């Protein structure tokens, strides 16, 4: 909210836009964002983190498929080999030994579709309302309201419980949600949804590296190989279009 007020509030007042249309799409965006978060959090009660990581990375495949077949967004040929590499890297990184699909895994898979639509909807909203900080601000506000209803209905929320986890909640609310998704919206002004999905697969890479640095978690040779494959996929998806434009005058 402070970033929105400082950087975009005055600019928005000068911009002529359809308020009803922007509100409608932002409402959908915030609701999808809220539902994706709910499914991700609840799924961890019924599955382990490794399985969750494997099935969440499915949005790397889902985003280009939905983009192309539903929204008719052009997909650069470099995306498909990059998607394949991301899936292989994600499997190696998680080192899942049990591939039985459980209830929690199903929630993660459904959540992957919501995360995919979230990436695409940000892309669509930016086409009609190119104010990424405002979009990020109001999607978080709507998602917060959306998530509060099931939280109050199915959980016992008390000030005492909140105070015990206040550091984690502030980190998740301010940095993981506020700042991170603001940067995502800002970056999507120039990136396609499929490219964003591939770059997001780096989440598992950073989680493994910081788990090794901060928590002394063992980083096996297989995980290191998975990290290298995902990095290769991201580099490939970004450099090939640039190379094609430079040498052949097209993307």
Residue ranges of predicted features:
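Structural signature of hydrophobic alpha-helical transmembrane segments
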Residues: 41-59, 103-114, 163-175, 228-230
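C-terminal-most transmembrane helix of multi-pass membrane proteins
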Residues: 5, 165-167, 175, 201-251
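Hydrophobic/small/kink-forming positions within alpha-helical transmembrane segments
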Residues: 30, 34, 38, 60-65, ...
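C-terminal transmembrane-helix exit sites in multi-pass transporters
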Residues: 2-8, 59-81, 205-225
